[in-house]
Amino acid sequence: RMKAGTADTVPFGFFKKSIFDTIGLFDERLVRAQDYEFNRRIIKSGGTVWLNPEIQVVYYNQPTLWLFLKKQLLHEAPYNAYMWYLAPYTFVFRHAVTGIFFLGILSGSILSFYFTWIKWLFFSVITLYTMLALIASIRQALRYKHIIHLFALPASFFLFHFLHGFGLVCGISKLLFGRAPVQKHDEPWEAAGRVRSFQVHNR
């Protein structure tokens, strides 16, 4: 069971009004990940983000797997890259794992034809990933008492990790080639003024 305590971010957080006067508003340049950037800004400024598992919310997810994956590919993943660009203090390694996964699958699939040691390394990593995905799927199948999880989740895990990684790499590529929809010189919110200096001086 999840315990109450400090966290690096929380979904649907409640904030004291005074915090907005101290560190500013949500960064409107970020279509996605606004809440994560704001929570990280709170921590960077010396504040605390507190997770209370007793608070319950009703969340309506995407109605189909395809819409969920499409959202990850076109919005969530690229905006992780844009967020790092605008606010480097938000970077954590776990958000980059899917990008590494995607590049590993892509490069491993190609290089395995030319190097034997890469073929065996690639095979070992894929085998480990498959085993971990199956273990997680078995746990969820037992938890929710639906055997369909045993078959659907491994494929869903792979599709999510691969497409999210692809979207992340695309976001980084757009930044490198100057085609990203975000710019540092744009105001993060209307009349950001002096508060905006936080993002400039806390990189």
Model segments located where?
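Catalytic donor/gating beta->alpha subdomain of glycosyltransferases that bind UDP-sugars
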Residues: 27-91
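Short, flexible, basic/aromatic active-site loop/helix in glycosyltransferases
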Residues: 1-12, 21, 81, 86
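Soluble, non-transmembrane catalytic domains of enzymes that act on hydrophobic metabolites at membranes
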Residues: 26, 31, 37, 41-44, ...
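Membrane-embedded multi-pass helical conduit in multi-pass membrane proteins
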Residues: 100-177
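A cross-family signal for key residues in well-ordered alpha-helices
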Residues: 21, 40, 44, 103
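Short, well-ordered alpha-helical scaffold segment located
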Residues: 18-22, 56
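Select subsegments of transmembrane alpha-helices in polytopic membrane proteins
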Residues: 91-99
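Short linear elements at protein peripheries
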Residues: 174-203
